[in-house]
Regions:
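Rossmann-like dinucleotide-binding domain that binds NAD(P)(H)
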Residues: 1-43, 47-111, 174
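Proline-centered turn/helix-capping motifs that create local helix->coil transitions or kinks
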Residues: 8, 12, 126-133
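Short, solvent-exposed loop/turn segments at secondary-structure junctions
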Residues: 21-23, 50-53, 123-125, 132-133, ...
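Residue-level detector of beta-strand face positions
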Residues: 33-35, 117, 133
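C-terminal helix-rich "cap/oligomerization" subdomain common to oxidoreductases
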Residues: 88-102, 106-109, 114-122, 126-129, ...
Length: 211
């Protein structure tokens, strides 16, 4: 949701969504699909499933979320790791992936948040961990992106700058509230079967550089 809002300018207007709760051991929504429109005419189709069957990292050149190479034969590891755990043990396992866990991954690529394809008027753009694939009118190209800092470091850097330098992050608290509004709107729309108007949306506090 954050990535799509950033690409579309942040100002969502309305969202229509459906959710799925397909695991009786975890009786809550674990998947959704949504159609969201933005100020200026942009429309986004968002789909997520947390049920660990299809691994969309195969669409990201077999690179994991934190930039690590996915190992051959590792399919299903996440589900197998949870099979013998009770809810408390599962919650503790998930904390090992947080900022303060002390664990790192051997990242050789930039981090990503799943497949993103932007369909534009003169080209389609596919985001990858190493750059942007460009599918133009008559040519196809690739814009390489420099390998960035350690996974999640930019988040920590923004926090330090906010506390020590009184510098507002690009995504402020208002931005987080706007993304949270989208999450609640997805649940509301799925429950009522109706589109939901968004009223707490905002832009980032930093203009994108172009040209």
């Amino acid at each position: 949701i954050d990535v799509v809002r950033r690409l579309a300018g942040g100002m969502g207007e309305k969202i229509y969504a459906m959710t799925g709760a397909w695991d009786p051991k975890r009786p809550t929504e674990g998947a959704f699909t949504a159609l969201m429109n933005f100020e200026g005419g942009c429309v986004a189709n968002l789909t997520y499933s947390g049920y660990a069957h299809f691994d969309s990292d195969i669409w990201m050149n077999d690179v994991g979320e934190l930039g690590q190479r996915k190992l051959a034969g590792a399919y299903g590891d996440a589900r197998r790791a949870l099979m013998a755990l009770d809810p408390d043990d599962e919650a503790r396992l998930k904390t090992t992936r947080t900022f303060g866990s002390g664990k790192t991954v051997d990242a050789k690529h930039n981090e990503h948040f799943g497949p993103v394809i932007a369909l534009c008027d003169r080209a389609d753009l596919k985001l990858t961990p190493d750059g942007v694939e460009v599918f133009g009118d008559t040519e196809r190209g690739f814009i390489e992106v420099t390998f960035g800092p350690a996974p999640r470091r930019t988040v920590n850097d923004a926090l330090v700058a906010a506390v020590r330098q009184n510098k507002a992050p690009v995504q402020t608290g208002a931005w987080g509230l706007a993304s949270l509004e989208v999450c609640h709107a997805i649940l509301q729309s799925a429950s009522t079967g109706q589109p939901v108007d968004l009223r707490q949306q905002c832009k980032t506090n930093e203009e994108e550089q172009t040209g």
